[in-house]
Amino acid sequence: SLFPLSLLFFLAAAYPGVGSALGRRTKRAQSPKGSPLAPSGTSVPFWVRMSPEFVAVQPGKSVQLNCSNSCPQPQNSSLRTPLRQGKTLRGPGWVSYQLLDVRAWSSLAHCLVTCAGKTRWATSRITAYKPPHSVILEPPVLKGRKYTLRCHVTQVFPVGYLVVTLRHGSRVIYSESLERFTGLDLANVTLTYEFAAGPRDFWQPVICHARLNLDGLVVRNSSAPITLMLAWSSAPTALASVSIAALVGILLTVGAAYLCKCLAMKSQA
């Protein structure tokens, strides 16, 4: 009937708060489930970034890292790293950190930013390494039936992540990992290997390869190729000379005895 409807309009006109309350209830009833309004104390979403995320330097050098964030009013910003820290510069939305005397081959730096009670972080990896200054393969030296191969890798760091490989033609004849070395200074490495060469091994190049494996970063350097030449050793040559001289002496003795025998037979005739 029209009476309840007219009464509703009358109440809304006489008491404006009733109409607004009814409107709020209607909107609340129509709102989808699982999407309540966020309380006023919820943390503000923000991001944290480090630049650069990966940096490689020579041992003993310094590094500058920049930590930026999108927090309107950060409560705190700090850097956690085992490396020694230097000067820190700050600006709106960023902090610049200086790391001194980097010597560990791989280190992490974490930048932590707290915003509205929530902490986020970003990470940079710092690698200290020195690629081999040179890789030198000495000319092979023949001793008996084996060639002595000697390879020099100079001024390399870290030695513990160095792999030295000798390649003859298309095949690897020797490879050694130097992971037992844990020094924190530049070093020179010499690898010596004896190679028994067969007839098919001559006239093929020998190359020494140096490789640093740094958790995904691979640094390579190689020597100039040296061809394995056929050579005579002094000991076999001397032995052959003695054998030939002995054979000649035997032949001369036999020949002289035969000649004397022939002459004796002729004189008797």
Curated annotation (Swiss-Prot):
S-S pairs: C67-C111, C67-C115, C71-C115, C151-C208
Gene3D superfamilies hit by this protein: Immunoglobulins
A single GO cellular-component term on record: plasma membrane
Domain Ig-like C2-type residue range list: 60-122, 144-215
Example GO BP: cell-cell adhesion
Keywords associated with the record: Cell adhesion, Cell membrane, Disulfide bond, Glycoprotein, Immunoglobulin domain, Membrane, Repeat, Signal, Transmembrane, Transmembrane helix
Annotated signal peptide: 1-20
PTM statement from Swiss-Prot or TrEMBL: N- and O-glycosylated.
Name under which the protein is recorded: Intercellular adhesion molecule 4
